[in-house]
Amino acid sequence: GGCRYFLGGCSEHSDCCEHLRCKMGLNYCAWDGTF
């Protein structure tokens, strides 16, 4: 359970915590530009 934090590994956006999204191809969570 739980969400992935900044630079955490991911396979889709829903893996990442709020305000983060999965960078496709690089497979880590990055800030999505929102607050």
UniProtKB/Swiss-Prot annotation:
Compartment list: Secreted
Signal peptide: none
GO MF annotation list: ion channel inhibitor activity; sodium channel regulator activity; toxin activity
UniProt KW keywords: Amidation, Disulfide bond, Ion channel impairing toxin, Knottin, Neurotoxin, Secreted, Toxin, Voltage-gated sodium channel impairing toxin
Disulfide bonds: C3-C17, C10-C22, C16-C29
Principal location class: secreted
Modified residues (Phenylalanine amide): F35
InterPro entries on file: Huwentoxin-1
GO CC terms: extracellular region
TM ranges: none
Domain of life of the native organism: Eukaryota
Tissue and organ expression note: Expressed by the venom gland.
Anything else known: Negative results: does not show activity on TRPV1.
Domain notes: The presence of a 'disulfide through disulfide knot' structurally defines this protein as a knottin.
Family assignment from sequence similarity: Belongs to the neurotoxin 10 (Hwtx-1) family. 62 (Vatx) subfamily.
Function according to Swiss-Prot or TrEMBL: Gating-modifier toxin with weak activity on Nav1.7/SCN9A and Nav1.8/SCN10A. Inhibits Nav1.7/SCN9A peak current (IC(50)=334 nM) and shifts the voltage dependence of activation to more depolarised membrane potentials. Shows 21% peak current inhibition (at 10 uM) on Nav1.8/SCN10A sodium channels.
Designated name of the protein: Mu-theraphotoxin-Pm1a
